[in-house]
Amino acid sequence: MSNQTNKAQDNQVEEIVEGELLNENGTEATGEASLMDELTQANFRVEELEKALQEAETKVESQKDSVIRAAAEVDNIRRRSAIDVEKAHKFALEKFINELLPVLDNMERALQGTDAEAEATKAIYEGVELTAKSFVSTVEKFGLTQVDPLGDTFNPELHQAIGMQPSADFPANTVMMVMQKGYTLNDRLLRPAMVMVSQG
């Protein structure tokens, strides 16, 4: 009986040990599975965070680019505004001076039509001449320049040819007579000089 009792006890011990081993393996397996789940979740979370970080970095780069473009646009607007203001200052007198040019032309015609040597008209000539010189020097202070090209080579940017005549005194394509002087304001042509050009 002791053999049978021993065997029965041994079987019971084996069953208990196997049960415990199964429990331990199950717990171990459950612990490992739980650990694996946590690790998988952590890896998934890391991937999500890396993706969010990458999206945030892309957004930051995009916004940096937008800020740079906006700053460049502001600089361009400032530059254009400064140029516009400068042009406005430079050429604000253009319309006014254009209205004064006929007055100056009339003074020059009066000088051409008056005999400077005759006693009766000498005083008038000198008065008109002084007035014309004073007038020209005043408007020159504001950037007006006369274009008086007598003897110069014809320049279509500054001169308007009224006609061409043969001339032994002037080489070909030279201004031989100025019908009406031209004017520039701050290097911008207001009116071309009306000229007669030699054919040579």
UniProtKB/Swiss-Prot annotation:
GO terms for biological process: protein folding. It is found in: Cytoplasm. One of its GO terms (molecular function) is protein homodimerization activity. SUPFAM superfamilies: Coiled-coil domain of nucleotide exchange factor GrpE, Head domain of nucleotide exchange factor GrpE. It holds the Pfam family GrpE. Keywords: Chaperone, Cytoplasm, Stress response. InterPro entries: GrpE, GrpE_coiled_coil, GrpE_head. GO terms for cellular component: cytosol. Signal peptide: none annotated. It comes from the Bacteria. Residues 1-29 are annotated as: Disordered. Residues 1-11 have a biased composition (Polar residues). Participates actively in the response to hyperosmotic and heat shock by preventing the aggregation of stress-denatured proteins, in association with DnaK and GrpE. It is the nucleotide exchange factor for DnaK and may function as a thermosensor. Unfolded proteins bind initially to DnaJ; upon interaction with the DnaJ-bound protein, DnaK hydrolyzes its bound ATP, resulting in the formation of a stable complex. GrpE releases ADP from DnaK; ATP binding to DnaK triggers the release of the substrate protein, thus completing the reaction cycle. Homodimer. Belongs to the GrpE family. This is Protein GrpE.
